[in-house]
Structures are given as C-alpha cells and as structure tokens.
C-alpha cells in the first residue's frame, strides 16, 4: 500500500492546475507566458487574481488530498511517503513532459496536513519577507529554508525533519533562476508581470 500511496500522490501532484485553469478557462497557454511556470505567481502576473487564486487553491488542495489518501492507505507512513511524492509530481509532472511548478503552494498543502502550527509560522515568514522585500520568490525561498528549522522547533519526529529538509532543498533548487535574477537585480517585484 505504500507503493500505491506513492504512485497516487505522484499522479495527483502531476495535475497541472495552473496550466489547466489558464488553458481551458481563460484560453491561454501559461507555459508560453511570463516565466513559463505553471504556478500561481506566474498565472497571477499574466492573467490576474482570479486565475491565480484558482491555481493556488488547486495546488494547495492536491497536496492536502495526497497526504490524506496516503494516510488512508498506509497510515502515518503512507502520509509521509505521499508528502514526498506529491511534491515531486508537482515539480516534474508526467502530464507536462516532466516540467512543473516551484512547489510552494503544494508544500503548504503538505504542511497543513502535517502540522497547523508549523504551517502558520512558515506562512507568516513567507508573508513577512514578501511584503518587506516585495519579492514573492524571496519570501518563498526563505520560508522554504525555514521549514526543517520550524519543524525541529516544534518537536516533530525525525522523519518529518527529513521531509522538511527535502522540501527546503526542492524549493531552493526550483527557484534557482529566481536566485540568479535576485542577484543580478532583475527579479520582478510585486506588481510587475514578467517573471514568475
């Protein structure tokens, strides 16, 4: 059942809500707009708040659902395995030739099902950094790197600390282009509509 939990989580994570929302509700191929990313930030910057919100809700929701299904299939171990694979699916979607999003929204879905306390603190870090710097990407990177530390602070089991480290590394890696733009001073701030 662990293998089934992993497989279902990967498939669910692969569902590209940003692409589907943009393509079939707004008639736009989001992979050809802005940064080409399927995440909520790029959708918002190119199509507006409603498509962005739908994308974010879908990406958070699939993270939550994958963990829930994993727990039904194989208890806590199933939930933990699903947490890894739903994020991998979102980053490397089988439906988009193994391209995907930057995993932040799906990570929040996983965190909601793991620990509300951790979720609230990580979200506060993301929001604070984003509002102060006006860079969504910087907020995402900093909150991602904080995940294992916040999990450790709240005394989560070692297996979840490993999950937190994995999420931190993945978020950092998926934002490598943003990091280059931040360093060069070309990253878009809140209110601009080019890179996502």
From Swiss-Prot:
GO cellular component: plasma membrane
Highest taxon of the lineage: Bacteria
EC top class named in words: transferase
Catalytic activity: an acyl phosphate + sn-glycerol 3-phosphate = a 1-acyl-sn-glycero-3-phosphate + phosphate
Keyword vocabulary terms for this entry: Cell membrane, Lipid biosynthesis, Lipid metabolism, Membrane, Phospholipid biosynthesis, Phospholipid metabolism, Transferase, Transmembrane, Transmembrane helix
Molecular function via GO: acyl-phosphate glycerol-3-phosphate acyltransferase activity
Phosphoprotein is among the record's keywords: no
Pathway: Lipid metabolism; phospholipid metabolism
Primary localization: membrane
Membrane-spanning segments: 1-21, 53-73, 78-98, 112-132, 152-172
Any GO BP annotation: phospholipid biosynthetic process
Topology term for the membrane: Multi-pass membrane protein
Cell compartment(s), UniProt: Cell membrane
EC assignment: 2.3.1.275
Subunit-level organization: Probably interacts with PlsX.
Matching NCBIfam families: glycerol-3-phosphate 1-O-acyltransferase PlsY
Function: Catalyzes the transfer of an acyl group from acyl-phosphate (acyl-PO(4)) to glycerol-3-phosphate (G3P) to form lysophosphatidic acid (LPA). This enzyme utilizes acyl-phosphate as fatty acyl donor, but not acyl-CoA or acyl-ACP.
Record-stated family: Belongs to the PlsY family.
Name of the protein in question: Glycerol-3-phosphate acyltransferase
Species in which this protein is naturally found: Carboxydothermus hydrogenoformans (strain ATCC BAA-161 / DSM 6008 / Z-2901)
Encoding gene, per UniProt annotation: plsY
């Amino acid at each position: 059942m662990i293998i089934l939990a992993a497989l279902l989580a990967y498939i669910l994570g692969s569902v590209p809500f940003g692409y589907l929302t943009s393509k079939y509700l707004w008639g736009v191929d989001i992979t050809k707009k802005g940064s080409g990313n399927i995440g909520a930030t790029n959708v918002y910057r190119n199509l507006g708040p409603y498509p962005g919100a739908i994308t974010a809700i879908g990406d958070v929701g699939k993270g939550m659902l994958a963990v829930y299904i994993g727990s039904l299939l194989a208890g806590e171990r199933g939930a933990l395995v699903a947490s890894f694979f739903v994020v991998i699916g979102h980053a490397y979607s089988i439906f988009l030739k193994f391209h995907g999003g930057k995993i932040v929204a799906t990570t929040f879905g996983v965190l909601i099902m793991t620990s509300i306390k951790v979720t609230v603190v990580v979200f506060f870090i993301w929001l604070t950094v984003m509002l102060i710097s006006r860079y969504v990407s910087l907020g995402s990177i900093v909150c991602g790197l904080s995940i294992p530390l916040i999990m450790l602070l709240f005394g989560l089991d070692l297996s979840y600390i490993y999950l937190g480290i994995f999420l931190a590394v993945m978020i950092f890696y998926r934002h490598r282009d943003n990091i280059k733009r931040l360093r060069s001073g070309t990253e878009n701030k809140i209110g601009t509509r080019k890179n996502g």
